């Protein structure tokens, strides 16, 4: 793109795409600059991104109004894990075909992606749980046309909160059991 800069001092094997994008060093692929906020592998969500990991910005210096998450186990318990098979794009509702394939050329996708049992959630159901619990998070994203997407990695946060809540309950029960055992309580008989 215009103004792309691949000149990261002496860097090799780099790809830089987009207006004002700058190289980062050896073996980097950079797509866009700080203005790029979305990257689609395929508009219909059928694309697959292969990576060994992803890293998201989480630096305290770029955050404000930090508070403890108020929900955990109660939130997780309302979610419905499901298994499903993906539909072939030709079987999408017409409004989605119009959105993803405006030229009318609906692509056929290989069976290797559509014959595999998938596991996950229904984004509309998760959004309903968010509304019910007044949970402001960006786990569910809805685009301007009403297409729902989920950021599954963000579910880790309420899951960790749920684990913390369960751990606190277990510790309290363990203390109660220890107290009962130390008092040598006998039920239904004499010492």
Predicted regions and their residues:
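Glycine- and small/polar-enriched repetitive beta-structure motifs of secreted/surface proteins
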Residues: 1-53
């Amino acid at each position: 793109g215009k103004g792309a800069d691949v000149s990261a001092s002496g860097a090799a094997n780099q790809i830089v795409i987009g207006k004002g994008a700058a190289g980062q060093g050896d073996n980097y692929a950079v797509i866009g600059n700080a203005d790029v906020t979305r990257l689609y592998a395929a508009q219909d969500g059928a694309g697959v991104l292969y990576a060994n990991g992803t890293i998201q910005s989480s630096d305290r210096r770029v955050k404000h109004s930090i508070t403890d998450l108020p929900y955990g186990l109660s939130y997780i318990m309302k979610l419905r894990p499901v298994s499903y098979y993906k539909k072939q794009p030709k079987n999408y509702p017409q409004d989605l075909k119009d959105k993803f394939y405006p030229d009318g050329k609906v692509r056929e996708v290989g069976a290797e992606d559509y014959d595999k049992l998938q596991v996950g959630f229904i984004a509309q159901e998760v959004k309903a749980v968010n509304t019910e619990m007044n949970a402001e998070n960006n786990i569910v994203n809805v685009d301007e046309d009403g297409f729902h997407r989920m950021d599954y990695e963000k579910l880790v946060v309420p899951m960790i909160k749920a684990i913390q809540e369960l751990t606190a309950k277990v510790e309290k029960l363990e203390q109660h059991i220890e107290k009962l055992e130390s008092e040598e309580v006998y039920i239904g008989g004499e010492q």
